[in-house]
Amino acid sequence: MSLRQLLLRLSGYLGASGPPSRHWWYFRSLDSISSAGSWRGRSSRSPAHWNQVVSEAEKIVGYPASFMSLRCLLSDELSNIAMQVRKLVGTGHPLLTTARALVHDSRHNLQLRGLVVLLISKAAGPSTRNAACQNYDMVSGVYSCQRSLAEITELIHTALLVHRGIVNLSELQSSDGPLKDMQFGNKIAILSGDFLLANACNGLALLQNTKVVELLSSALMDLVHGVYQENSASTKENSIPDDIGISTWKEQTFLSHCALLAKSCQAAMELAKHDAAVQDMAFQYGKHMAMSHKINADLQPFIKDKASDSKTFNLNSAPVVLHQEFLGRDLWIKQIGEAQEKGSLNYSKLRETIKAGKGVTSAIDLCRYHGNKALEALESFPPSEARSALENIVFAVTRFS
């Protein structure tokens, strides 16, 4: 049986019903990218679609990113967890969506972080300052330890996704399903997320590099800190969001969405014995690409067609924060009040109000600014297919129409 067949069998085992109607602590990751025009220049391939960019990048590193953590996903322990997850089919628990996304990578590309780590490892190549590094085993231009790091990065990210799929029982409504189903799903989410983190910690220890352990440990700490800040700043429906500026937003976003990729890219350079300058450029690429990607995701409700106008959006997203910053706190609160209808916030009306201001265009400019910073960091790496693929990823996340 092929690896693809194994993955499809696992997805079928988890059930084929649609996604749950409501998520609680689940967040959008580096998954959904729009395709539109670029600004700074074009890569040699000038990619038009996100899936095309990812597919070409996977060919360069040797295998699809969705297979990177396959050894963990097909372990006996996780097979037992999958049997328990199957019991959640039909309950609408967010854990089901995460599980399906892990095996249906064609649409969601949850494992982008590991792919970027492999690409930047190949783009940098072996270190010229340490001859001992030349003796390490290398496949498709990437050391085995760097491939292990890519898997570890994905395990950490996936564990966070699973943990953030926990249902907030205090906000549970009768329409969400029986309480016992949600409690059971929460237990499985906690245990399976902990299992993935344990595998990541074991993999880190096997790398036998204390600096890499320190980098990934600090990235995990940043993630937890960032998620805590997001949960503290998150607002219930129809309530006034916190008063934060774009500088504070960027600090929080770095912790929750950028730190893992940035420090994993730096760790990949450390494993290949590159000097501090190369490590810093890898860090800067990961940081700014992830930041640009997050802003792109925040912009989607404001640049898509009217089919999505009825949907809600995050009142602490980049375009909204910038809109409030330009407008002033008092006028922003007034606009929220004007968008209230029968005790409920009319997101369609508020969206049009925000689109009429400067927040959306400023967010697009900010997205492109960070994209430019990511491209500048890549200039320190020699020209190669891997570097072009990294550039294509930046072009894809900074294109709008």
Swiss-Prot record:
One Gene Ontology biological process: cerebellum development
Domain of life: Eukaryota
InterPro entries given in the database record: Isoprenoid_synthase_dom_sf (IPR008949), Polyprenyl_synt (IPR000092)
Signal peptide range: none
Full protein name: All trans-polyprenyl-diphosphate synthase PDSS2
Function: Heterotetrameric enzyme that catalyzes the condensation of farnesyl diphosphate (FPP), which acts as a primer, and isopentenyl diphosphate (IPP) to produce prenyl diphosphates of varying chain lengths and participates in the determination of the side chain of ubiquinone. Supplies nona and decaprenyl diphosphate, the precursors for the side chain of the isoprenoid quinones ubiquinone-9 (Q9) and ubiquinone-10 (Q10) respectively. The enzyme adds isopentenyl diphosphate molecules sequentially to farnesyl diphosphate with trans stereochemistry. May play a role during cerebellar development.
SUPFAM superfamilies recorded: Terpenoid synthases
Consequences of knocking out this gene: Homozygous mice for PDSS2 are embryonic lethal. The oldest PDSS2 embryo identified is at E9.5, and its morphology resembles normal E6.5 mouse embryo, so the development of mutant embryo may be blocked at late gastrula stage. Conditional knockout mice lacking PDSS2 in cerebellum show severe cerebellum hypoplasia during cerebellum development, whereas conditional knockout mice lacking PDSS2 in Purkinje cells at postnatal stages leads to the development of cerebellar ataxia.
Pathway field: Cofactor biosynthesis; ubiquinone biosynthesis
Record note on quaternary structure: Heterotetramer composed of 2 PDSS1/DPS1 and 2 PDSS2/DLP1 subunits.
Enzyme class, UniProt record, top EC level: transferase
GO CC, any one term: ubiquinone biosynthesis complex
Record-listed E.C. numbers: 2.5.1.91
Molecular-function GO terms, alphabetical: all-trans-decaprenyl-diphosphate synthase activity; protein heterodimerization activity
Keywords recorded for this protein, A-Z: Isoprene biosynthesis, Lipid metabolism, Mitochondrion, Transferase, Ubiquinone biosynthesis
Keyword Methyltransferase part of the UniProt annotation: no
Major localisation: mitochondrion
